[in-house]
């Protein structure tokens, strides 16, 4: 499960489930005959721990809020954007996200963006259709039929937004206490914390789960299966995120050409169209949006202006006091 059969002449890409598919790097396969080596992580904390423990990879695909932390840990190398033919077509606001350009050097290539929100069964919880709130995930009426992401950013931060933390990513002690209390209150209501989005999607499709934290792709897939789901714009605000690639300090220099080929393939218009249409995510390449019909974009929930969409919601930032929050989350899950 963890690593696909490794081939010594390809770089290793460490990424999320779903972003490893060949359709997102077709030009690389066309040029080099196969995909690179792929390893999958459930979240960035797991990825970081594995790399710290000596797992060597060439590229990782974290979200922006991790980049300053990984930079400070000394595990990133700058990326030479002049080697990327698709760089000029990347949405300009994504190129300068705080914490991703350091001392004038680019440490992150923005390729994927979207939201963390709630996917829910409109047929099973109709009272939320015109009352969209994160509060559905705390509704005792749906005890045992709710699911939450098993992660700091999409779990603990959701609780922080729900309790009204002024800045969920930099909470006061009082807000941390309230967040902990909210997670404790929620625990007996959950069917599970999900680590794999496909596990959550199956439960929603079956009606075992009525509402869950989800990314756009979960909603897009369920909707495509004809399930009566909606994707919330919660009154407290959805979370907006941007993910993309980092070049690891211990990359294999002999594979650098292939590393840049992979990045450029993922940044292409054709990869962007696939990601937009199949997953309902935004893509870094502005031209990819021009290649999808306005009707299709609307159906997928995109206002035609990517910049406007990126400016909406609560933008993920590096989490202050991360180790303490991680410990608190583990304690809550253990019933403490």
Predicted regions and their residues:
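Early extracytoplasmic/lumenal segment of secretory-pathway proteins
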Residues: 2-69
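Extracytoplasmic ligand-binding site segments that recognize negatively charged/polar headgroups
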Residues: 19, 56, 61-202
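A ligand-binding cleft/hinge motif common to bilobed small-molecule-binding domains
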Residues: 66-71, 213-228
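Short beta-strand->loop
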Residues: 77-88, 108, 227-239, 250
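A bilobed periplasmic-binding-protein/Venus flytrap-type ligand-binding module shared by bacterial periplasmic
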Residues: 119-124, 160-164, 242-255, 274-278
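Periplasmic-binding protein-like
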Residues: 176-186, 225-249
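Mature extracytoplasmic/periplasmic domains
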Residues: 248-313
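Conserved C-terminal helix/tail region of periplasmic/extracytoplasmic solute-binding proteins
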Residues: 306-336
